[in-house]
A protein has these predicted regions:
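Accessory DNA-binding and partner-docking regions appended to nucleic-acid-acting proteins
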Residues: 1-22, 42, 380-381, 408-634
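Helicase motor core with emphasis on the C-terminal RecA-like subdomain
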Residues: 10-26, 30-34, 38-50, 54-60, ...
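Short, charged low-complexity linear segments at domain edges
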Residues: 375-405
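Short, solvent-exposed alpha-helical surface patches in well-structured domains
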Residues: 116, 205, 266, 292, ...
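Alpha-helical structural signal
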Residues: 40, 64, 305-307, 311, ...
Length: 634
């Protein structure tokens, strides 16, 4: 991976410091989107900014364009704080392709190469330098920044994944806490902090810990309209996942999240045995294997990465067509961040999750057993409750999700609940039976029991344990025989989610919450979702992806005729060859959307090719003639 690059530019790309001209000439886009223009101007003018923008919303341009503008104005280098080596590699590779002099400093560089990058930095030739916080805060690196600052060559500090500084957030990283030192040391250097998600607590923590009290706050819509949200009741979760992948995403790239390393290994192996191109990823694998698997995911088509949440942050792959969860995340922020890794190219993607009572039990137990203070536990319980409300919702998932982030919207018409509203039943009587059973079993034995035993009592199943405890003599024995075991599991799960039942101790026993009294007295009605016995069919206004090869050869955006499809296929073949030669993911060369526009419009000269969105001056110079040759083929 090159860390610095040729500074030659296309004749049309004058060294303008105007942000819009930079956007057009360097990156090949005609206009800024949403809040981008206001953010860029704030930073170009030397102000601080805190940017909350969803994944795929164009956060990188919010600091890359100002970095180029300020460098061209003689103000020096932009330092980008990034937590992941993979992200640094891909960002520098993409900037290289666009003709922007940039580099990274991390443990992947040999000593000679690292020293060469440092010389480029100190000479003022770099526009952007990417580094991790732990490297930036070393005495050696701070001394280099001191030297740059004294010469007026420390232009801007960009802090990516800023939520990592917050202990209230879903991905706290202790090394981020030291970044406030940079503002104390260089108070006149403007800063931009960026994150894809942050609730009020996390947002306040970012502002406090990074001393961004004077920063202008930019909040874009959290809506990802191209993502369809589906949450199903767990029943043989791996089989449910396989059915989802085969029915909807055969041949597509995607991510499957699991909570434990063992489950990652087991699921990846099982999916591979079922014929899918599935790979495991978790922190327990050695670094070389993690890097190999990540590179395959980024560079190959149709790879399914089965991973813990150690995977995903900073992954810029635009054509991830699905994100699946086999376990419940910790909170809505984590769910939003993880599902947001799908559909970065703006094309349709699925967020699919299987969820059951054991998920609720496990998450509650982890909170209760953590060594955190009671205030932190209380906040985490509240966040989990919000996620459970989303999982059990009868109405639009998107409305629920956006409401959590303080944004109001209309029903999307595209989530599972909108496409097929769930059946709801009056479960007041069943809930009272379940709560009474929990109470009677505890009263008889002096301690609580788990869901399996309680269901046996409710259904009148005389197991050894039921007989030993004398629970077959209770008035609640057999009072729920008319309800199937799976439905009782749904009742108990939803009572836990509603807060009427508590999960206690290392054995995950169930106990009554204070709110259960009102239900038992018949003062509060209980409406629950009907337990699903078969996969719910949902129709797509956007069309199915089923069938061999799935969506991998399907061009995005507007449909192409037969000739256009042939051009698109030829362009993808050409792009793959270039990507291999440059050791880059294919999307760094050109996104699918750019190739699709080329295939549709079939430009026959450099000027018209340069008008395609995503074709900047450097790429036009480097690839223009070759692309025209591909497009001219019959």
């Amino acid at each position: 991976m090159p860390t610095t690059l040729n500074t030659a530019t296309h004749a049309g790309a004058a060294s303008s410091s105007d942000p819009l001209q930079i956007l057009q000439q360097v990156f090949g886009y005609t206009a800024f989107r949403g809040e981008q223009a206001a953010v860029v101007q704030q930073v170009v003018d030397g102000g601080d900014a805190l940017v909350l923008m969803p994944t795929g919303g164009g956060k990188s341009l919010c600091y890359q364009v100002p970095a180029i503008a300020r460098h061209r104005a003689g103000q020096g280098v932009t330092l980008v704080v990034s937590p992941l080596i993979a992200l640094m590699h891909d960002q520098v590779g993409a900037l290289d392709e666009a003709g922007v002099v940039s580099a990274f400093l991390n443990s992947s560089l040999e000593g000679d190469e690292a020293r060469r990058v440092e010389r480029e930095l100190m000479a003022g030739r770099l526009v952007l330098l990417y580094a991790a916080p732990e490297r930036i805060l070393t005495p050696r690196f701070l001394a280099m920044l001191d030297s740059l600052h004294e010469r007026g060559l420390f232009s801007l500090l960009a802090i990516d994944e800023a939520h990592c500084v917050s202990q209230w957030g879903h991905d706290f990283r202790e090394e981020y806490l030291g970044l406030s030192q940079l503002h104390e040391r260089f108070p006149d250097v403007p800063r931009i902090a960026l994150t894809a998600t942050a609730d009020d607590h996390t947002r306040g923590d970012i502002i406090a810990r990074l001393a961004l009290t004077e920063a202008r706050l930019f909040i874009s819509s959290f809506d990802r309209p191209n993502i369809r949200y589906t949450i199903v009741e767990k029943d043989e979760a791996k089989r449910q996942l396989l059915r989802f992948l085969r029915d909807e995403h055969e041949g597509d790239a995607g991510i499957v999240y699991c909570q434990s390393r063992k489950k990652v290994e087991d699921t990846a192996s099982w999916l591979a045995g079922e014929g899918l191109n599935a790979l495991p990823y978790h922190a327990g694998l050695d670094a070389a294997m993690r890097r190999r698997h990540q590179d395959r995911f980024l560079r190959e088509e149709g790879v399914v990465m089965v991973a813990t949440i150690a995977f995903g942050m900073g992954i810029d792959k635009p054509d991830v067509r699905f994100v699946a969860h086999l376990d419940l995340p910790k909170n809505i922020e984590g769910y939003y961040q993880e599902t947001g890794r799908g559909g970065r190219d703006g094309q349709p993607a699925d967020a699919w999750m299987a969820y059951g009572l054991a998920d609720v039990v496990n998450q509650r137990r982890m909170i209760d057993e953590s060594e955190a203070g009671e205030e932190f536990k209380r906040l985490q319980r509240g966040k989990l409750e919000a996620l459970l409300a989303l999982a059990e919702a009868h109405d639009c998932r998107r409305v629920r999700l956006l409401t959590y982030f303080g944004e109001h919207s209309q029903a999307c018409g595209n989530c599972d609940n909108c496409l097929q509203p769930p059946a709801v039943w009056d479960a007041t009587d069943a809930a009272r039976k379940a709560l009474s059973c929990i109470y009677r079993c505890h009263q008889a034995s002096g301690f609580s029991f788990g869901s399996g035993h309680l269901i046996d009592v409710l259904r009148g199943k005389l197991t050894d344990k039921v007989a030993q405890r004398g629970h077959d003599k209770l008035t609640t024995f057999g009072i729920g025989a008319d309800i199937a075991e799976q439905q009782w599991r749904g009742v108990l799960r939803q009572l836990v989610a509603l807060g009427h039942v508590l999960v206690e101790g290392e054995y995950n026993t169930l106990a009554l919450a204070d709110s259960a009294r009102a239900v038992l007295r018949g003062e509060v009605p209980v409406l629950l979702r009907v337990a699903s016995e078969a996969p719910r069919k949902t129709s797509r206004s956007r069309g199915s992806r089923s069938g061999t090869g799935g969506g991998r050869d399907k061009p995005p955006s507007l449909p192409l005729d037969e000739a256009g499809l042939a051009r698109f296929a030829a362009l993808k073949t050409w792009r793959a060859e270039v990507a291999r030669a440059h050791n880059l993911p294919a999307y760094v060369v050109f996104h699918d959307a750019t190739l699709a526009q080329m295939a549709r419009e079939a430009p026959n000269d450099l000027d018209s090719l340069g008008g395609i969105s995503g074709v900047g001056a450097k790429k036009l110079e480097a690839y223009g003639q070759a692309l025209l040759g591909v497009l001219a083929q019959d």
